[in-house]
Amino acid sequence: TAAKAGKSVIVMEKTHYAGGNTSVAGGCYNAADPALEAKQEMSPQRRASVDALLAEPVRSKLHGELIQKVKEQLAQYDAKGGKYLFDSVELHALQSWKAGDYAGNLDLVYELAKGAPEMQKELAEMGFKWNSGTEQVVGALWPRSNRASNYKSGVGYIDTFLNEIKTKHLPVTFIMNTAASDILMKDGRAAGVVGTAENGRTFKVLA
């Protein structure tokens, strides 16, 4: 997004190739897509798991707001006599937060859940082709896992971005074999990062 807006972008890559672990991962992408997931049925077991999630003690203001939002969504779903698989970004956030034993930052978890469908759409606009249905991969909590039809692994995400950078001549520079070891803050905002090269040398990249 920043590069498309004309900003110069520097990407620190810990490994010697772009993408790191994502490139060798299975390629599944979890994102709430109610319309696509509606091809599946809402089993009694899945409904029970949602009801149990919504009965959890409220742990924060945002937690309570998300629970209330999903309750309202479910009420609308029930009013329509819904038998198809229910989902929403709020349910995705609640399930993800609980799966992490509530240790994560719920604000960030919610941003991740909201951003997943947006990035899915952006990837499609860049030429990434998604399968016409979702599934529930091993370890997932809900059948909202998406796969590509034109790639077999996570390398597809990286190749799509690299191709976009190349074809549109975006101002993106990669620094390989370098870990971003610290974030530099100024007035409560990220102002740069500290990079640690493979030989142990450290340097700063300022925004």
Model-found features: residue ranges?
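Glycine-rich FAD pyrophosphate-binding loop
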Residues: 4-25
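Short Asp/Glu-rich motifs
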Residues: 20-22, 42, 141-143
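N-terminal glycine-rich dinucleotide-binding loop that anchors FAD/FMN and/or NAD(P) in oxidoreductases
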Residues: 24-59, 79-82
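Conserved redox-cofactor binding core of oxidoreductases
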Residues: 87-203
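Short, ordered loop/turn segments at secondary-structure junctions
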Residues: 14-17, 29, 34, 179
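Short hydrophobic core segments
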Residues: 10-12, 180, 204-207
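Aromatic-residue-lined binding/catalytic grooves and analogous aromatic/hydrophobic interfacial grooves
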Residues: 34, 57-67, 72-82, 99-100, ...
